[in-house]
Amino acid sequence: IMVTDAATGKTLYSARSTTPRTPASTAKILTATAIAAHTDLAGHRTTRVTRNKNTLTLVADGDTLLARGHGNPYATQGHAGLADLAERTAKALKNTPPPPGGWQLTLDDSTASGPALAPEWETADVHAGLTAPVTMLGLAEDRATPGHPTTHDPAMTATTAFRDALITAGIPVAEPITRTPKNAHKGKHIASIASAPIGDVLTLALAESDNALTESTARRAFADRGIPATFAEAGKHIITTLKSLGLDTTHSHLADASGLSRSSRVTVRLINKATTLAANKNHKQLTHILDNLPVAALTGTLHDRFATPQTTTGRGIVRAKTGTLTGIGGLTGTLVTNSGRLLTYTILADQAPPTTSLETRAALDYVATTLVSCGCN
């Protein structure tokens, strides 16, 4: 455990905070910090259509939250809609007679393309909907959630939905849909749609602890910096970036960006210092991360937490990124004490009995609530 005064950076309490431990999803704070350090969180990912003779190419750019129908400009999921893209494509082709048999539709998902699944991820976790293949294109409705796994090939599922949208918009499409070879000529740009701001996507990934969304967001952001699109390289880049921000990364390494790999080892100190850095108002992009973390008993992965009489004081006050794997539980975030001090705190329990996950969560919630109740000054 480590507790820090957010305003001064002074360590108020620390116990075994320099021992490397499996972080589970608290690692997402490190990933978000690395993304925010070099990425414009107000930017967007653009899904495009290009034309080359009789071929229309759907060019992926990292938006895995597409709507099958029309987009909703006020939403993060479904912000950009394939129906809108199809209608814009139809408008661009209105003076062009379709080729005999229809337009050939192909998918280009070569940008930031890499392994879909990390070597250490359990197949059972994929089938259970705890994660999904990491792609650069996907439907919001096809996101993996516990008990509801995604389709085998989310990018092609989205492309098939786009084909249907084209047909609805009056554009005949030939079968089959194909994938464009890497570095193939993409043709002339004719239509596009933009995702929600990257910061909003990152906020959603952390709020719901979405492993695949975190991985795809990180992979696409890191590709802009020339980082190879693998899980291991993403982990290395996160640690390298944190070190460049002045954080002590000794004995820490990440095997992926989401925290799902059990071989990742980081110190509580590193997680807490990254959380404290994000709480510093001089780092506005990083502050965006903390401002939108789940709130105890209200939102995200904390919506059903702090439910006991002993933890009611923490409700609505504690913010945290949660971390949960079998035998592992964690919280890292911010809270305000009864004396009005903003604290950052990080707690990791990595030796809990596998059958006591609920008890572990309750214990973590109790510790955070105790910090709220104290007069730390």
PLM feature spans:
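A small/polar active-site loop signature that marks catalytic segments
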Residues: P133, D142-H288
